[in-house]
Swiss-Prot record:
Keywords: Ribonucleoprotein, Ribosomal protein
Protein family: Belongs to the bacterial ribosomal protein bL35 family.
GO cellular component terms, A-Z: cytosolic large ribosomal subunit
PROSITE patterns on file: RIBOSOMAL_L35
UniProt GO molecular function: structural constituent of ribosome
Keyword Oxidoreductase: no
Name of the protein this chain belongs to: Large ribosomal subunit protein bL35
BP GO annotations: translation
Gene3D superfamilies associated with the record: 4.10.410.60
Disulfide-bond pairs as recorded: none
PANTHER family according to UniProt: 54S RIBOSOMAL PROTEIN BL35M (PTHR33343), LARGE RIBOSOMAL SUBUNIT PROTEIN BL35M (PTHR33343:SF1)
Xref: HAMAP family: Ribosomal_bL35
Source taxon at top rank: Bacteria
The gene coding this protein: rpmI
């Protein structure tokens, strides 16, 4: 039986760490002039994935 392939789109977007799965925030690529400075500041950096989404992403990354 062949090896299971990782979803390459998911591999580019998520990173497995000791504390969980890390991801970048959405809505931060273009047309940012209408967004407030506070909102853009809150979307900076990365955060951990919500526990309800972890199983789906682990399946895409073939961690499970």
């Amino acid at each position: 039986m062949p090896k299971m392939k990782t979803k390459s789109g998911a591999a580019k977007r998520f990173l497995k760490t000791a504390n969980g799965i890390k991801h970048k925030h959405a809505f931060k690529s273009h047309i940012l002039t209408k967004m407030s400075t506070k909102r853009k500041r809150q979307l900076r950096g990365s955060s951990l994935l919500h526990p309800s989404d972890v199983a789906k992403v682990e399946r895409m990354l073939r961690l499970r």
